[in-house]
Amino acid sequence: MDSEYAALLERAYKLVAPKAQRRAEIPKIEVENMPRKTIIPNFGQIAKRLNRDVYFMAKFFQKELAVPGTLEGDVFTLHGEKSPKVVEAVYDRFIRYYVVCPVCNSIDTELRKEGRIFIMRCLACGASTPVRPL
């Protein structure tokens, strides 16, 4: 009985697809410091991979860091010198507040505005969660 059960269990594991990893891993942010400027060259690519509006992300960074910024293509320039650790901490906060599903911890989410409220909908589990406004 035990060997038959083990054989059936092994067969079942072979038939079932392996557990899927996250559809997309969280991309790393690149930070370059210049005199009186902080440049994030892969900002547009990050926004695209996270399925977020690049202007929404830029507004979040500007408010959190309290500095103005300009967006030219994929490059986001902050007009103030900030350390890479501070920028990475703000990026991690953005991920936590506006990207990761609080129910299943998936990053496969979309953000949409319904009236005055931003709603984050998880594409993995289907949960809809209101998020704090900018």
UniProtKB/Swiss-Prot annotation:
Question: Subunit structure of this entry?
Answer: Heterotrimer composed of an alpha, a beta and a gamma chain.
| SUPFAM superfamilies, per the entry | Translation initiation factor 2 beta, aIF2beta, N-terminal domain (SSF100966), Zinc-binding domain of translation initiation factor 2 beta (SSF75689)
Q: Which keywords, in A-to-Z order, does the entry hold?
A: Initiation factor, Protein biosynthesis
Main function:
eIF-2 functions in the early steps of protein synthesis by forming a ternary complex with GTP and initiator tRNA.
Q: Which domain of life is it from?
A: Archaea
Q: Which organism is it from?
A: Pyrobaculum aerophilum (strain ATCC 51768 / DSM 7523 / JCM 9630 / CIP 104966 / NBRC 100827 / IM2)
Protein's recorded name = Translation initiation factor 2 subunit beta
Mind telling me which HAMAP family this protein's record contains?
Answer: eIF_2_beta
Keyword Protein biosynthesis carried by entry: yes
Query: In its keyword annotation, does this UniProt entry include Disulfide bond?
Result: no
